[in-house]
Amino acid sequence: VIAPGVLARTVSDYTHRRPSESPTLAPLWQTLAQHAKAGACHHRGTCPLVTVGPVVVNEHHEVPMVRGGRAPARLPEARLTEGFDTLTEAAFDLARALGVEQLWIQPGCEDPIQLHTARADPQDGDRMRVAVRYLVRTHAALCHFAPGAPQVWTPLTEVDLELARRVDSFMASGAR
């Protein structure tokens, strides 16, 4: 199980590297502080929903997007579940479950590349969703999506321009 302190440290480290994003992540940070103080969650389903996901970039600068019914395609992410000690491990497991068998972390990019905030899906209630995203690399030929699978390669610039700029910067410099 990913310890609450691991998530708190991840958010803290991320906001120190990107102070301009601190106001957006403040509700999550406040909730984590309240949980630590109380020793548990007493918010009855109103806490920010935290998910984790890989931003899998191939040699063509494309990422696999997941389509789901009528909903628009989006970057893969999943709720935190039992069995993982780190957020990175959970992101890698999701990538492998999608058919990305051979993947590696871009050198210098061991920390999340993005903490993406959005409104949670309707079935999750009226609350914030925070996707902890890790940059991982692969080659398209090493991915084995099942026939009819919901994954589709999409140019990163069509997904999220800010994320594309951040990925370009990381890949060019290896800097945090």
Q: Predicted regions: what is each one?
A:
Residues 13-53:
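Acidic, metal-coordinating catalytic segment for phosphate/diphosphate chemistry
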Residues 36-40, 51, 87, 116-121:
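Short acidic (Asp/Glu) patches
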Residues 96-142:
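Active-site segment of metal-dependent pyrophosphate-handling enzymes
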